[in-house]
């Protein structure tokens, strides 16, 4: 696993069945001491975090990307140079206007949009937005 010795990964999911399945996979991989699960909504989990982070992978309710990112910023949870990786921003572009404006135009981030096809569907355009916190 590509984490520093003292590093860990925190996964947040509101669906208890998804968390249970993920825990089994992580246990099978022998990573149960490196991966921690929070079974709650994103805003509850963000408010519960005690330490800042270097990498954030966002892939949940698309209309919450922007508000959750602002919450993390306001709580000083994103380390300088931290990466925010937002998934599925192409197919849900209409819900991403505030998010895009913030990571592209606020000056707080250096951001890049990378186009791709939706998994398992070569005929559907999608994209990810990768942003570095300045």
For the regions a language model picked out, list residue spans one by one:
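S-adenosyl-L-methionine
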Residues: 15-52
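Conserved SAM-binding motif I beta-strand of class I
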Residues: 8-13
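C-terminal substrate-binding/active-site "lid" region of AdoMet-derived donor-dependent transferases
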Residues: 64-134
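Short SAM/SAH-binding signature in class I
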Residues: 51-58, 83
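A general structural motif
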Residues: 6, 53, 79-81
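Conserved SAM-binding loop of SAM-dependent methyltransferases across substrates and taxa
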Residues: 1-5
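Switch II (G3) loop of P-loop NTPases
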Residues: 59-63
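Short, conserved active-site loop motifs that form the nucleotide-linked donor/cofactor pocket
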Residues: 7, 34-36, 82, 109
